[in-house]
């Protein structure tokens, strides 16, 4: 290795036979003092001390080299290079290393070396240099084992040792605490989502709502027909679970709840469009029992399940209609999602207001006859959001067979309360007859821009005259749905032929915005109608007896009672025969 940087001076003449040994360098003033005449007079004592110092340094360098920790350079302390012989003698004079360390005498050692008195770290630096350069050799001389160097500060020694002893235990405790916390969060989150989704299987929480809606498609695609009804609740549940997994821990403010419901409604509608087309192409031609489940959000308290069995067309050409209607719930919530099946039956995914009228049957929405060819061959675009390029969820099925009732026109109920209304001057995307089309435009314009306080118009079933339908014969088997709420666009006039259920189409046209769009957070109500041949043939049957005349009710009362039982808003007098009252126009004052 490298030689010692500083060589000792040559011994005096009387010790000339000793070899030249490396000694710790001395400053010039010390060397001049050592060479002073007074020290030259005491040359025998000075020579013996220098000889001892030189022997010590030779053996020290040799030992440190054999120990593989050679002393390549001697550090400076207090603006002076350390004299290893002096520091060794000072520590031995004060009682060896252990006693100096125990009594905190390293500052005295520093003073013996003649360092600058203003140094703040003098004691610590002196001790470290001694431990690194001299202490191993001193222990070797005393026959002690070469122990590892003790910690720097003895008072903090106890705390550090205590922390080191408990290090493994504390880390294990921290890991166990983290694991238990993660398990507890994982247990609470599935419980929350299960209570929201009413017993459905828990799906993994996704990072964003877009990923969850994209991954839902291939999962629920090849499922049995029941997944067609549960795909929208699963989309709602996955979005809700992803919201809770982002750190909300089950606590939602009202504003966050409204935002979440809006996001869920958008994603739900898009998902239902994809799933409706997918299930519409794969459903078998047999009775399909649908179990729509009422979506219960964080703020809902009641849960009611409805199991409508919608019969398909019998061989004789008649339609079998059966429904099992449960008791009227107190606070229903609506999702407004539908699926289209190849048998032209419109399946509701969740509970709708038509289920709360015990006399009304859960029915199909049928369209005009003989419109499969000609200018209406193209699909009537049920636009939601104003984008007509996206495929609708209500494409016709793959079956082309002719049935007693022709191809129906699906009725889309928007899950959003705020739907952009079309301009009154915009051309209608649906083919319309001249007479009825102009009347429909005037009616919608009057309701949308009238600015008057609207009153609920009593819905009645009435045959449309052939004059209003453009001189064409009315088909007896057609019925339409009445939308109590904002409509995405003008309804095709062909859907109003035959038996009709007349209801105001724009309840949100009120001048008071708080009573209009803001007060309808969920889907507008849907009141189904019936084919005319059933009304004509059932005379005093229970369904005919259950037809009700709804008295004119203020719009405020309708809003107050829209979440309550139907009997509180409209009374149902027993009717034995069907009376055809006069025709009401939408812009007629009551």
From Swiss-Prot:
Compositional bias per record (Polar residues), positions renumbered to this chain: 33-42, 187-210
Annotated gene: Arid5a
Region of interest (Interaction with SOX9), ranges: 1-294
Gene3D superfamilies in the record: ARID DNA-binding domain
Keywords attached to this entry: Activator, DNA-binding, Immunity, Innate immunity, Isopeptide bond, Nucleus, Phosphoprotein, Repressor, RNA-binding, Transcription, Transcription regulation, Ubl conjugation
Gene Ontology cellular component list: nucleolus; nucleoplasm; nucleus; transcription regulator complex
Sequence ranges of Basic and acidic residues compositional bias: 160-186, 367-381
Induction: In macrophages by LPS, IL1B and IL6. By IL6/STAT3 signaling in T-helper Th17 cells.
Region (Disordered): 1-52, 141-229, 275-323, 367-402, 419-443
Tissue specificity field: Expressed in T cells (at protein level). Expressed at high levels in cartilage, heart, testis and bone.
UniProt protein name: AT-rich interactive domain-containing protein 5A
Occurrences of domain ARID (ranges): 50-142
């Amino acid at each position: 290795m490298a030689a010692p940087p500083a060589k000792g001076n040559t011994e005096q003449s009387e010790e000339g036979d000793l070899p030249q040994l490396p000694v710790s360098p001395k400053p010039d003033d010390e060397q001049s003092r050592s060479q002073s005449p007074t020290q030259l007079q005491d040359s025998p004592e000075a020579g013996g001390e220098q000889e001892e110092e030189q022997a010590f340094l030779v053996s020290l360098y040799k030992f440190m080299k054999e120990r593989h920790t050679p002393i390549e350079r001697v550090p400076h302390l207090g603006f002076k290079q350390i004299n290893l012989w002096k520091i060794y003698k000072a520590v031995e004079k004060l009682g060896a290393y252990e006693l100096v360390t125990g009594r905190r005498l390293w500052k005295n050692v520093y003073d013996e070396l003649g360092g600058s008195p203003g140094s703040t770290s003098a004691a610590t630096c002196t001790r470290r240099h001694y431990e690194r350069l001299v202490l191993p050799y001193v222990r070797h001389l005393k026959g002690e084992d070469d122990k590892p160097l003790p910690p720097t500060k003895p008072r903090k020694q106890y705390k550090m040792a205590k922390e080191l002893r408990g290090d493994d235990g504390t880390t294990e405790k921290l890991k166990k605490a983290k694991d238990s916390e993660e398990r507890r969060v994982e247990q609470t989150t599935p419980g929350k989502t299960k209570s929201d989704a009413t017993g459905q299987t828990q799906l993994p929480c996704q990072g964003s709502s877009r990923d969850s809606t994209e991954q839902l498609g291939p999962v629920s695609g090849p499922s049995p027909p029941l997944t067609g009804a549960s795909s929208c609740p699963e989309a709602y549940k996955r979005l809700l679970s992803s919201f809770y997994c982002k750190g909300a821990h089950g606590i939602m403010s009202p504003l966050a709840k409204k935002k979440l419901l809006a996001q869920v409604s958008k994603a739900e509608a898009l998902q239902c469009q994809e799933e409706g087309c997918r299930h519409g192409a794969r459903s078998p031609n047999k009775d399909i029992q649908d179990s729509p489940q009422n979506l219960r959000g964080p703020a809902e308290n009641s849960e009611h399940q409805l199991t409508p069995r919608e019969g398909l067309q019998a061989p004789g050409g008649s339609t079998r209609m059966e429904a099992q209607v449960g008791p009227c719930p107190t606070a229903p919530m609506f999702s407004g999602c539908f699926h289209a099946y190849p048998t032209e039956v419109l399946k509701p995914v969740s509970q709708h207001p038509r289920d709360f009228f015990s006399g009304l049957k859960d029915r199909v929405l049928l369209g005009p006859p003989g419109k499969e060819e000609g200018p209406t061959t193209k699909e009537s675009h049920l636009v939601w959001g104003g984008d007509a390029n996206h495929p609708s969820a209500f494409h016709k099925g793959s079956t082309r067979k002719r049935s007693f009732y022709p191809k129906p026109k699906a009725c889309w109920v928007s899950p959003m309360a705020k739907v952009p209304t079309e301009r009154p001057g915009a051309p209608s995307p649906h083919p319309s007859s001249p007479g009825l089309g102009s009347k429909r435009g005037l009616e919608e314009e009057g309701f949308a821009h009238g600015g008057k306080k609207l009153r609920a118009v009593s819905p009645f079933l009435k045959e449309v005259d052939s004059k209003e339908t453009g001189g064409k014969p009315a088909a007896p088997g057609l019925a339409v749905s009445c939308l109590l709420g904002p409509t995405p666009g003008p309804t095709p006039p062909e859907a109003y032929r035959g038996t009709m259920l007349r209801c105001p189409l724009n309840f949100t046209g009120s001048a008071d915005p708080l009573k209009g769009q803001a007060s309808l957070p969920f889907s507008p109500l849907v009141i189904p109608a019936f084919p005319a041949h059933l009304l004509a043939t059932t005379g005093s049957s229970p369904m005919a007896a259950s037809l009700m005349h709804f008295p004119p009710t203020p719009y405020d009362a309708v809003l107050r009672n829209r979440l309550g039982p139907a009997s509180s808003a409209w009374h149902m007098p027993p009717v034995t025969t069907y009376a055809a009252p006069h025709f009401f126009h939408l812009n007629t004052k009551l």
